[in-house]
């Protein structure tokens, strides 16, 4: 059972580089249970998206989990619809690259209603600019966290190259 949960957490961590799972959000899986991770991504076929897909696919194969992709083009309606689609498809967790903080309220609520774990990659909810959305995420047992690049430092470094 613990091995299957470790696989679920590991694929989410690999895909989104998530460091931890809250203790209250741990679900056990029996041996032989299939785990499916949904990936809501802007595009799985462009240069960056295809490389992300390759990494996620390799991690999924190594961990013996299934992956389902929905390309949402960073269109708000498609981002929120992708979460609904992945939940309806029976995903155990979703890794999302959303385009705006406002989309995360709906995504979190959908995941809570379906008891599906959710994490962000390449994005993070702004505590300063979106305090209500940030608090919704903090209060959710299904929101696992986010990993993103340090855009300020990256910009500074690029300017100084």
Where are the language model's segments positioned?
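A residue-level marker of the well-folded mature domains of exported/periplasmic proteins
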Residues: 2-7, 13, 25-161
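Hydrophobic core
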Residues: 13-21
């Amino acid at each position: 059972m613990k091995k299957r949960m470790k696989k679920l957490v590991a694929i989410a961590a690999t895909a989104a580089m998530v460091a931890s799972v809250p203790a209250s959000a741990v679900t056990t899986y029996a041996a032989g249970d299939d785990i499916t991770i949904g990936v809501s991504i802007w595009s799985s076929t462009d240069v960056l998206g295809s490389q992300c897909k390759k990494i996620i696919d390799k991690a999924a194969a190594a961990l013996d989990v299934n992956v389902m992709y929905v390309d949402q083009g960073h269109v708000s309606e498609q981002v929120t619809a992708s979460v609904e689609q992945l939940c309806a498809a029976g995903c155990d967790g979703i890794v999302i690259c959303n385009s705006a903080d406002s989309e995360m309220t709906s995504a979190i609520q959908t995941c809570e209603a379906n008891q599906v774990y959710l994490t962000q990659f390449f994005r993070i909810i702004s505590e300063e600019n979106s305090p209500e959305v940030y608090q919704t995420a903090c209060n959710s047992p299904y929101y696992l966290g986010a990993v993103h690049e340090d855009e300020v430092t990256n910009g500074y470094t690029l300017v100084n190259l």
